[in-house]
Amino acid sequence: MPKRTQEELAVLQELILSNLTNVRMIILYGSYARGKYVIWDETYDERGVTTYYQSDLDILVICDTRDANKAERHAREVIVPKYDTRMEGKRHPAPPNIIVETPVTINSCLLYTS
């Protein structure tokens, strides 16, 4: 994983821990976790249309909260803007994707998928 991305993740970890309460776990998932991330891809189709793609940072936060939706909104409205400010000029073009769930929800999902 690129050093710059590691720095971004460290900033996100710090912001998550200082802005959400009762955080149990912070999990990186998606293409960066699998090591199959795309730094930058530019594709041209037969009509001459150009598309661009770059992997984003997918983060699952597990915390003890009564309202995971409210915590997730807080992440979008408070943590992501603070991240943008801290990483100005050095961050991914796409904002990080932060999902917040409770341990009960995660455990229920694991029971149903196993």
What are these regions (language model features)?
Residues 23-44:
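Short gly/ser-rich loop at a beta-strand->alpha-helix junction or flexible surface loop bordering the NTP-binding
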Residues 112-113:
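Conserved small/polar residues in nucleotide/adenosyl-binding loops
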Residues 37, 107-109:
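Acidic pyrophosphate-coordinating catalytic loop
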Residues 1-20, 46-107:
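Metal-dependent nucleotidyltransferase catalytic core
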